[in-house]
A protein has these predicted regions:
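N-terminal active-site segment of His-dependent metallophosphoesterases
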Residues: 1-84
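Extended active-site neighborhood of metal-dependent phosphoesterases/phosphodiesterases
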Residues: 3-18, 45, 81-186, 207, ...
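Active-site-proximal beta-strand elements of phosphoester/diester hydrolases
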Residues: 23-40, 150-160, 188-190, 245-252, ...
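Residue-level marker for buried hydrophobic side chains located in beta-strands
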Residues: 26-28, 70-72, 107, 189, ...
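Active-site glycine-centered loops adjacent to acidic/histidine catalytic or metal-binding residues
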Residues: 31, 74-75, 110-111, 192, ...
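Histidine-centered catalytic micro-motifs
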Residues: 34, 189-195, 229-237
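Short acidic, glycine-rich surface-loop motifs adjacent to enzyme active sites
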Residues: 77, 182-199
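Binuclear metal-dependent phosphoesterase catalytic core
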Residues: 237-349
């Protein structure tokens, strides 16, 4: 058996079977931020005008792959509910594009879709009953359960947490009951906001779930041994390990949050719009589910665009990097010039 056949079966290069057979693959995309028109945009940043074309490329790229389902982690569209005319137009653009997906799509509400998490200093309006009604009218349930073989995927509305709305208690009771019902199965959680991105006791900020809801959610991860958590919102890739749960923060398909460019020692070029158009940081995840684990593959899109009406280029070959989980002989290493683990403070507004 050759190396490529080993990888397809979830084997490492020695022929062992730490993961077992591959069961299926899902795609996780996030922060697509579709605008109300092909080039119309209510953002002051030029790169945001490309969101629709970049999403169209992602849809066609997904259609080339063998995937079982697609989960969008929120901020489907860019106009917020406070501007209902633009919101509705962006919804129409989103639905037109995803109607071409071959795999079924499931959506998580983001702060642009249903209102920001409860706080007094958010740049947009917070979640409320009217915004919830708008979401359910256009996209369906705020939270849901998806069963695939012995895996259970829970999609939640993170903006409800700490809101005090009646739906918060309903979601809380639903999630606790559903997790109890899923005992013995492999559990995955999908949320727009991450519980945290630096450490579990970090201060409240724009990009995490506030207390006391954060501790409640983390407690559920621990209690039910959730295999993996996937979140968006920060438009940058992060990986954390919370007890036994792998926590992934996904990149955006549309643009990068320029405030996080301050983490790096080299300033963005003018073409990168202060880091907002840093092309190698754009993409999505393929989550390969095996019998005894999962492997996340980051697909970089490099901001590729597909204008409306153009035919997709299906001649470009699909290539994948072999993941270390699939290669027990991965022994290559090198000394870092700069510490990747250092903690860097960034300005809160970019």
């Amino acid at each position: 058996m050759n190396r490529s056949e080993n990888a397809a079966l979830g084997l490492d290069s020695s022929g062992d079977q730490p993961l077992g057979a591959k069961l299926f693959t899902l795609a996780a995309i996030s922060d697509t931020h579709l605008n109300q028109g092909e080039v119309e945009c209510n953002s002051p940043f030029p790169v945001n005008q490309l969101a629709n074309q970049r999403m169209r490329y992602v849809v066609q790229d997904l259609n080339r792959r063998d995937i079982n389902l697609v989960i969008n982690l929120g901020d489907l569209i860019h106009p917020v509910p406070a501007v209902p005319k633009l919101y509705s137009a962006a919804v129409a653009c989103f639905k037109e594009q995803v109607s071409e997906l071959k795999a079924p799509l499931f959506c998580v509400p983001g702060n642009h879709d249903i209102g920001d998490k409860p706080n007094d200093w958010a740049p947009a309006g917070g979640i409320c009953e009217a915004y919830i009604d708008l979401w359910t009218e256009h996209f369906g349930p705020q939270y849901q359960r998806i069963d695939r073989q012995e895996c259970v995927f829970f999609l939640i509305n993170a903006q409800l947490i700490n809101s005090g709305l009646k739906d918060e208690l309903e979601q809380k009771q639903w999630l606790e009951a559903q997790l109890q019902d899923a005992i013995g199965k492999r559990i995955f959680l999908f949320s727009h906001y991450p519980p945290y991105f630096s450490h579990a006791l970090e201060d409240d900020n724009y990009d995490n779930i506030s207390e006391p809801g954060r501790s409640w959610l983390l407690g559920l991860l621990d209690q039910h041994r959730v295999e993996a958590l996937f979140a968006g919102h920060v438009h940058n890739f992060w990986f954390n390990k919370h007890e036994q749960t792998d926590c992934y923060l996904l990149p955006s398909t549309a643009f990068v949050r320029q405030d996080y460019s301050e983490m790096f020692r080299i300033a963005p070029t003018p073409e990168q719009e202060h880091g907002r158009n840093d092309l190698p940081k754009l993409g999505y995840f393929l989550v390969h589910i095996y019998e005894h684990g999962h492997v996340c593959e980051l697909v970089r899109t490099y901001g590729q665009c597909q204008p409306k009406g153009d035919l997709p280029d299906i001649t470009v070959p699909i290539s994948s990097v072999i993941h270390p989980k699939l290669n027990s002989r991965c022994r290559f290493g090198f000394d870092m010039r700069h510490n990747w683990m250092e903690v860097v403070e960034i300005p809160p507004t970019g």
